[in-house]
């Protein structure tokens, strides 16, 4: 039997992915201070951040649950790009991304509080960016959307206008690779499809 799933994230996009897949869950953000963890390696960074978020939430549970933590960054030209701190930086990054290919990394952490088991993995998706004009970039930043997204774009929102194509898991670019999460659940002896019955 599948224990209750707790999503340790404030991300509306991650919530929507789970909801669309018919997976019941509850949200409990970790409010973890991401500045505590630093790394120049995107794989290490997203896995450590996802794990830290999941650990904070797992420690607060009083019943057996599965805690899912996630964190995403865009890796472009040797630079790790998380959420931009302000509109000016968002514009700079979007200009930098024009016509480039970036890699979107998402760390996935899964904690089974009943078995006291922890898994951490990552997914990577290549993102091929379009060449928006300065005017289009300013209009996009003015919507506020890129200020809430790793890498300054939301492929499931207005930012989709500026992505030519991707190679890899689409959900990963949104914030959660459901195929990877399914495999992680299986590794712990659970099936996400049990949530459908």
From Swiss-Prot:
Broad class of enzyme this protein falls into: hydrolase
The entry's keywords: Cytoplasm, Hydrolase, Nucleotide metabolism
Major localization listed first in the record, in broad terms: cytoplasm
Hydrolase as UniProt keyword: yes
InterPro entries (alphabetical): ITPase-like_fam (IPR029001), Maf-like (IPR003697)
Keyword Cytoplasm: yes
EC number: 3.6.1.9
Domain of life: Bacteria
Subcellular location, record wording: Cytoplasm
Pfam assignment, any one: Maf
Entry-linked HAMAP family: Maf
Protein family per UniProt: Belongs to the Maf family.
Function, in words: Nucleoside triphosphate pyrophosphatase. May have a dual role in cell division arrest and in preventing the incorporation of modified nucleotides into cellular nucleic acids.
Protein name: Nucleoside triphosphate pyrophosphatase
């Amino acid at each position: 039997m599948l224990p209750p799933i707790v999503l340790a994230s404030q991300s509306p996009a991650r919530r929507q992915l789970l909801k669309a897949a018919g997976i019941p869950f509850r949200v409990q953000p970790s409010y973890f201070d991401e500045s505590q963890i630093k790394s120049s390696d995107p794989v290490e960074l997203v896995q450590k951040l996802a794990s830290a978020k999941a650990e904070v939430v797992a420690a607060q549970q009083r019943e057996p649950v599965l805690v899912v933590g996630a964190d995403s960054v865009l890796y472009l030209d040797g630079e790790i790009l998380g959420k931009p701190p302000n509109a000016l930086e968002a514009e700079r990054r979007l200009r930098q991304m024009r016509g480039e290919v970036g890699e979107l990394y998402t760390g996935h952490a899964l904690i089974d509080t009943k078995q006291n088991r922890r898994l951490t993995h990552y997914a990577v998706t290549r993102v091929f960016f379009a060449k928006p004009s300065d005017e289009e970039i300013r209009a996009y930043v003015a919507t506020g959307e890129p200020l809430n997204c790793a890498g300054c774009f939301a492929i499931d929102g207005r930012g989709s206008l500026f992505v030519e194509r991707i190679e890899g898991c689409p959900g990963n670019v949104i914030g959660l690779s459901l195929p990877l999460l399914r495999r992680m659940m299986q590794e712990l002896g659970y099936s996400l499809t049990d949530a459908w019955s």
